[in-house]
Amino acid sequence: MGVNDTHGGAPGHRHPHPPDDPSGHPRIGFVGAGRVSCALAVVFARAGWPVAAVATRDPDHEARFLELVPGARAAPSVSAIADDVDLVFVTVPDDAIADIAATLRLYAGQAAVHTSGALGSDVLEPARAAGTQIGSFHPMVAFAEQDAAVAALSGATVAVEGDEELVALLGQLATDIGAQPVRLPPTGKTAYHAAAVLAGGGIIGLLDGVAELARGAGLDEAGALAIYVPLIRQALDNAERIGIENALTGPFVRGDVGTVRGHLEALSRLAPGALEMYRATARRELSIAVSRGELDEAQAAPMRRLLEDR
């Protein structure tokens, strides 16, 4: 099925160029031509889903997109992109999505989809018209670099949400690019995205704190990464293999108050910017240790007092 299977809609609001792509897939257009849209356009086209058009106000981004996706054309405006496509992907910053939705003019049988991880499809309601559908398609991928993002999309998780028929189509699209679709309720997207920010950006913030503290031990950034990244990988592997609780090791499992006191003193002197982060993660680790039965509440109490903000 395709989004263009629906006909009718408001009088005088029929698609001016009915679909004729031999693949049977809806023709895709992008609003925005940044890293996300370029990577998605490349993998969609490789998977046999036709990418027909892009609308962007940035001429350099437009040129890059058209170079990456031969056969696509530049639409003169956001409102005009629907004239040549069936499925519009809105790949702009979250705060701009509602404004774009208000500008889109969808025809019956078309759909609009955004790629925000935090917002539900309801932000696209201004674009909805009779016989149209809205949804969201969020790949769990870091789009820092084009080639790496394209490679990472194969095997990635893609959160899909929105109108029933469209969600089925988006799930098929995700599968066709080698990704794993996961359906989310609209109310769950903010928590899902916050977890993604912790998993992706949070680990970088943690590494920055690690590097700051390691400088106190005479290590530069490269030296710190060489030592601590393998430890992080081991911890992640353990969590995946035996579960989060069982993967925890260190002074909080053992109840080593003296060790933690020494850490806090060193942080205060050498890396005060990382002190708050250490306390926050330490409190979480201590709770895991108690939950796991390594410490009881009486044993954990001295550590909790030590970790209180001051």
What do these predicted regions represent?
Residues 1-18, 275-279, 284-310:
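SAM-dependent methyltransferases
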Residues 49-50, 132, 179, 219:
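Short phosphate-binding/catalytic loops that engage adenosine nucleotides
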Residues 24-27, 109, 155:
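Phosphate-coordination loops involved in phosphoryl transfer and adenosine-cofactor binding
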Residues 59, 69-148:
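Rossmann-like NAD(P)(H) cofactor-binding subdomain of soluble oxidoreductases
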Residues 237-299:
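Interdomain hinge/lid region at the active-site interface
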Residues 2-76, 80:
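NAD(P)+-binding Rossmann beta1-loop-alpha1 motif at the extreme N-terminus of oxidoreductases
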Residues 29-30, 90, 160:
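Hydrophobic Val/Ile/Leu positions in short beta-strands of Rossmann-like dinucleotide-binding domains
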Residues 62-68, 127, 148-241:
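Internal alpha-helical scaffold of NAD(P)-dependent oxidoreductase catalytic cores
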